[in-house]
Amino acid sequence: MANHKSAEKRIRQTIKRTERNRFYKTKVKNIIKAVREAVAINDVAKAQERLKIANKELHKFVSKGILKKNTASRKVSRLNASVKKIALA
């Protein structure tokens, strides 16, 4: 265990940040999974609706500093491509 006050504080901060990061990472995964599920069943309307939500949420995470800009853009771009693919088919 920590012997210094500053080390104890760092442990508390790490625990708090870990919980917060886990929450956001799970949320990102669930958002992406929702779009992919709609694409898998070829439901264009649902996929486009969920893509719109995913785009908004992922860019919100960028502004909060949870995701990097390029990471969010890459994820949105790939989701967009998959939705576009079923829309044209």
UniProtKB/Swiss-Prot annotation:
<dbReference type="Pfam" id="PF01649">
    <property type="entry name" value="Ribosomal_S20p"/>
</dbReference>
<dbReference type="GO" id="GO:0070181">
    <property type="term" value="F:small ribosomal subunit rRNA binding"/>
</dbReference>
<comment type="function">
    <text>Binds directly to 16S ribosomal RNA.</text>
</comment>
<dbReference type="InterPro" id="IPR002583">
    <property type="entry name" value="Ribosomal_bS20"/>
</dbReference>
<keyword id="KW-0694">RNA-binding</keyword>
<dbReference type="GO" id="GO:0003735">
    <property type="term" value="F:structural constituent of ribosome"/>
</dbReference>
<comment type="similarity">
    <text>Belongs to the bacterial ribosomal protein bS20 family.</text>
</comment>
<dbReference type="GO" id="GO:0006412">
    <property type="term" value="P:translation"/>
</dbReference>
<keyword id="KW-0687">Ribonucleoprotein</keyword>
<keyword id="KW-0689">Ribosomal protein</keyword>
<dbReference type="GO" id="GO:0005829">
    <property type="term" value="C:cytosol"/>
</dbReference>
<keyword id="KW-0699">rRNA-binding</keyword>
<protein>
    <recommendedName>
        <fullName>Small ribosomal subunit protein bS20</fullName>
    </recommendedName>
</protein>
<dbReference type="GO" id="GO:0015935">
    <property type="term" value="C:small ribosomal subunit"/>
</dbReference>
<dbReference type="InterPro" id="IPR036510">
    <property type="entry name" value="Ribosomal_bS20_sf"/>
</dbReference>
